Amino acid sequence: MAIHNRDKFLSNLAANLGRPRKTEGVERPEYSVQPQYEVLKGASQDELIDVLEKHCEVIHTDFVRTSKQELPHVVRQTIERYEAKSIIASNDKRNAEYGMDQAYNQFAEELDMHIWDASIGKENQVIAEKADVGISFSDITLAESGTVTLKNDKDNGRSISLMPKSYIAIIPKETLVPRMTQAAKQIHDDHMNGIQTPSSVCFVTGPSNSADIEMNLIVGVHGPVNVTYIVVD
């Protein structure tokens, strides 16, 4: 991305501060108090899962814990509970690892099953809009707030978790972190290590919730009405 007028802007800012512009020797300050690192510090993965499960009750999200072997069966049960007839899922490399590629092939025998296909462009969004359920993997999962982090790219469109009536997030156990602090650091570290960050990183916390000035809660206005988190050991 091109940068325009940066030097002019910074020089003008320094002049208004009454000092020369600093171009080197600038370091991020170390704050004496950093409580963000103390929340759930030292918690095990199982303890973080317990925190996530408890918070799912607050954010109106169904929580299921299962094994990798049972995942396709649990996903199928969830789809049936939602009475879904059409599904859209991400074209994630983890589909094969977790047995979901075979599961999707089986679903396609009875349901309208679509795997995100970069070659058809915006047609994916049209399909997502009509789908009953969207399914994708969480890349980083925040236990404290019950948030899944979705790194959207050409094989994992944002529409999967946004447009269908219901959404299923598959959460590998190892993606659990205490809170936003660790998620932000992980994304930052990836960038500093030369790992390309997707243009869209979405933090999704349960179903869409909106409230007016009288605190009347309305679910599903800006996203899914139903959300299920499936944690996989």
UniProtKB/Swiss-Prot annotation:
Q: Which GO terms describe its biological process?
A: lactate metabolic process
Which Gene3D superfamilies does the record match to this protein? NagB/RpiA/CoA transferase-like
Q: Which domain of life is it from?
A: Bacteria
Q: Which residues form each disulfide bond in the chain?
A: none
**Family as reported in the entry's similarity comment:** Belongs to the LutC/YkgG family.
What HAMAP family does the annotation carry?
A: LutC (MF_02104)
Task performed by this protein: Is involved in L-lactate degradation and allows cells to grow with lactate as the sole carbon source.
In its UniProt entry, what is this protein called? Lactate utilization protein C
